[in-house]
Amino acid sequence: VVIGHEMTHGFDDQGRQYDKDGNLKDWWTEEDAKRFDERAQVMVNVFDSIEVAPGVYGNGRMTLGENIADHGGLQVAYQAFKKATAANLLPVMNGLTPEQRFFLAYAGVWGNNIRPEEVLNRTKSDVHSLGKWRVNGALPQIGAWYEAFNITENDPMFVPVDKRVSIW
């Protein structure tokens, strides 16, 4: 996921401003930029709506680049996982399918305990969303996650398809 995350930075709200030679240059068509901005705004809205502490909400604009990179990295990693395991039937282990284990491994990377004061500090100053929201904000945007866990509209983390983030 980390490699996909870093690759995706080349096409996030900041990276997209640089051309193939690393020069700051607006190389996107007006229509492409408009569509990207519209789709990125969906991501901003998702993270703006997360209440990280009572009365305190995430800053989707400030964390946009990292959230896009998390989203893209997760998609790239899942596609690589499926391609790498396509020829080998992986077993169910401890009641979990390989796909479920993939998403649980992603979630495990971001599991942490931080003090309430640090939640407030990071929400105001860090361009990365808090670990919990790098999971709970990202996974409901990924169709394969719904399939892996049989998520339905009755589940609390369900997001209708037409409301999910789709940058590319």
Which sequence ranges carry the predicted segments?
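Zinc-dependent metallohydrolase catalytic domains
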Residues: G10-W168
